[in-house]
């Protein structure tokens, strides 16, 4: 087992978690805003 490779993989995995969480959060915000606009359109009609 190559420990340097394993340590690099673990460091990359740990550092990629916040990035993926932030991107998922922004996607969720965009979708919820879109859904709210659709609901408002139906609410007026």
UniProtKB/Swiss-Prot annotation:
Chief localisation class: host cell
Keyword Transmembrane attributed: yes
Keyword vocabulary terms for this entry: Host cell junction, Host Golgi apparatus, Host membrane, Host mitochondrion, Host mitochondrion outer membrane, Membrane, Transmembrane, Transmembrane helix
Keyword rRNA processing part of the UniProt annotation: no
Name of the featured protein: P3a
Family: Belongs to the polerovirus movement protein P3a family.
Coiled coil: none
Gene Ontology cellular component terms for the protein in this record: host cell Golgi apparatus; host cell mitochondrial outer membrane; host cell plasmodesma; membrane
Annotated localization: Host cell junction, Host plasmodesma; Host Golgi apparatus; Host chloroplast envelope; Host mitochondrion outer membrane
Transmembrane segments: 9-29
Role of this protein: Together with movement protein P17, plays an essential role in virus long distance movement.
């Amino acid at each position: 087992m190559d420990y340097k490779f394993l340590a690099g993989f673990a460091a990359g995995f740990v550092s990629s978690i916040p990035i993926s969480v932030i991107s998922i959060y922004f996607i969720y915000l965009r979708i919820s805003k879109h859904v709210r606009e659709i609901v408002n359109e139906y609410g007026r009609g």
